[in-house]
């Protein structure tokens, strides 16, 4: 098996897909895959057993939906361009505009698709501003005070995205704001898309609450088709990134295990969010605890503490995270396994510094490993053309 490697576990993927399909059936809604979180098209035959559509935010994603998933996309983009718009329309069943000006500019060229408008309820509980689509000054969506009383006759739906790995309780509170702001326009619509961020495959997610919410919404607005488009929920906890220790260095009492992967290149959300990924067989140590462990006066200060910062193999100074405490001394060549590394990774990786890209594999239910993709010098060179 080539390493480093992202490994998708088919059994876990099917578990998520079955849960999502069950929610869609019980709640009488459509749940579609957001490519921005996961777009490994060689897995699409499995997805098509459970869902029928996907969502795209660019021409490339719309083409992937149409050509590889086999169905036109539900497409939304912050801004369409003249050069790409017609081809996007040809690959889409639904097309949502981010602003009234974009609608006015392009809607006459969107014949044959169901047109939507993104709205902003000015409410979101996402704490990290980088991921909050409703933060003050946002570029996303139209607020209620800017909508005409009567919508243009070809607008068929509203799109509203307010969540990031959120629970059903958050959706319930958000839904109240959406209805308060926009319900008076619902009689003019055919569908509403509540966006992504509904992490229904997380263990503590209240699936039954979500189903009740959607059933209640249907009772109030029986003519509206409801769409959810999560991304992470599909690939949540479906596989790791397997790396290896290539060197161990020490400075000022801090030991760093340098790996053959990069946080910057291969796990960018860890630095952007930021968040500490789970490492198999290791415990995340908070900064204060880490300082105490490294203190000369600490009873735990000894080689047996096995405390390491993990460093990436790019030349970016900040390409590291830590600390983690292991139950043994790390050795050169030893595996370091980052859990839950299938969503928002392969769609965001890069080849900064020419760093080698991990392979991508699938562990099938029968225990056989299939290598879906390996990367080499040609991939780097071709990006530099």
Where are these regions (language model features)?
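Charged (often Lys/Glu-rich) extended helix/loop segments that serve as interaction or gating elements
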Residues: 230-294, 299-385
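N-terminal capping/small domains of soluble enzymes
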Residues: 1-69, 262, 326-339, 343-345
């Amino acid at each position: 098996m080539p390493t480093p490697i992202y490994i998708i576990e088919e059994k876990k993927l099917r578990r998520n897909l079955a849960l999502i399909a069950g929610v869609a059936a019980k709640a009488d809604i459509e749940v579609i895959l957001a490519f921005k979180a996961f777009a490994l098209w060689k897995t699409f035959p499995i997805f098509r057993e459970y869902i029928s559509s996907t969502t795209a935010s660019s021409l490339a994603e719309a083409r992937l939906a149409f050509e590889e998933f086999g169905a036109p996309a539900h497409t939304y983009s912050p801004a369409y361009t003249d050069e790409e718009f017609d081809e996007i329309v040809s690959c889409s069943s639904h097309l949502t505009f981010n602003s009234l000006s974009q609608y006015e500019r392009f809607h006459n060229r969107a014949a044959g698709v169901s047109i939507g408008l993104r709205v902003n309820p000015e409410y979101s509980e996402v704490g990290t501003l980088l991921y909050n689509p409703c933060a003050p000054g946002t570029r996303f969506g139209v607020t209620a005070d800017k909508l005409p009383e009567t919508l243009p006759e070809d607008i068929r739906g509203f799109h509203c995205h307010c969540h990031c790995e959120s629970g059903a309780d958050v959706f319930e509170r958000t839904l109240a704001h959406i209805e308060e702001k926009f319900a008076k326009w619902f009689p003019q619509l055919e569908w509403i898309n509540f966006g992504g961020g509904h992490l229904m495959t997380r263990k503590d997610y209240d699936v039954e609450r979500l189903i009740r919410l959607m059933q209640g919404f249907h009772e109030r607005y029986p003519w509206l088709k409801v769409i959810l488009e999560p991304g992470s929920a599909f690939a949540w906890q479906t596989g790791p990134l397997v790396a290896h220790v290539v060197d161990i260095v020490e400075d000022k009492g801090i030991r760093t295990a340098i790996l053959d992967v990069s946080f910057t290149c291969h796990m960018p959300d860890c630095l952007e969010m930021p968040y500490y990924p789970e490492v198999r067989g290791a415990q995340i140590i908070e900064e204060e605890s880490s300082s105490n462990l490294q203190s000369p006066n600490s009873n735990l200060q000894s080689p047996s503490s096995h405390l390491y910062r993990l460093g990436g193999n790019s030349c970016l100074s900040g390409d590291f995270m830590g600390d983690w405490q292991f139950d043994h001394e790390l050795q050169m060549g030893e595996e370091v396994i980052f859990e839950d590394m299938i969503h928002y990774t392969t769609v965001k990786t890069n080849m900064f510094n020419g760093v080698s890209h991990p392979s991508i594999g699938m562990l099938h239910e029968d225990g056989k490993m299939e290598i879906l993709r390996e990367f080499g010098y040609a991939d780097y060179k071709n990006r530099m053309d």
